[in-house]
UniProtKB/Swiss-Prot annotation:
Part of a stable entry-fusion complex (EFC) which is at least composed of proteins A16, A21, A28, G3, G9, H2, J5, and L5. Formation of the viral membrane is necessary for the assembly of the complex. This is Protein J5. It comes from Vaccinia virus (strain Ankara). Keywords: Fusion of virus membrane with host cell membrane, Fusion of virus membrane with host membrane, Membrane, Signal-anchor, Transmembrane, Transmembrane helix, Viral envelope protein, Viral penetration into host cytoplasm, Virion, Virus entry into host cell. Belongs to the poxviridae A16/G9/J5 family. InterPro entries: Pox_virus_G9/A16 (IPR004251). It is a single-pass membrane protein. The lineage of its organism: Viruses, Varidnaviria, Bamfordvirae, Nucleocytoviricota, Pokkesviricetes. GO terms for cellular component: membrane; viral envelope; virion membrane. GO terms for biological process: fusion of virus membrane with host plasma membrane; symbiont entry into host cell. Its main location: virion.
Length: 133
């Protein structure tokens, strides 16, 4: 399709998922502004194989230097100390490692002196200082 045909189709079908890269929601554009990363570099409809993209947008997308990673936790089992992590970042490394599991330190350490005695102690200290100086 030519750029004119793409724009004509998307003008008539703004809610079509294939046109969402040309007409994204305002919230998507705002996220792009806030992160200082153009929305077309990370917005999923722009990555679709059937997305309708004019030539200028295709050119801009090729200049994106973003690694789009999807990391998901798979089988998490505390009893077997096993953690499967699925990393989809164009890397081919697959590692299965056993992780040592230990309980958190949950000891409660109480102060030596109760906090309610602090003002009385400070007052007594001030009286002693005033009495001797």
């Amino acid at each position: 399709m030519t750029d004119e045909q793409i724009y004509a189709f998307c003008d008539a079908n703004k809610d079509d998922i294939r046109c969402k890269c040309i007409y994204p929601d305002k919230s998507i554009v705002r996220i792009g502004i806030d992160t200082r990363l153009p929305y077309y570099c990370w917005y999923e409809p722009c990555k679709r194989s059937d997305a309708l993209l004019p030539a200028s947008l295709k050119k801009n997308i090729t200049k994106c230097n973003v690694s789009d990673c999807t990391i998901s936790l798979g089988n998490v089992s505390i009893t077997d100390s096993k953690l499967d992590v699925n990393n989809v970042c164009d890397s081919k490394r697959v590692a299965t490692e056993n992780i040592a599991v230990r309980y958190l330190n949950q000891e409660i350490r109480y102060p030596i002196i109760d906090i309610k005695w602090l003002p009385i102690g400070l007052l007594a200290l001030a009286i002693l200082i005033l009495a001797f100086f």
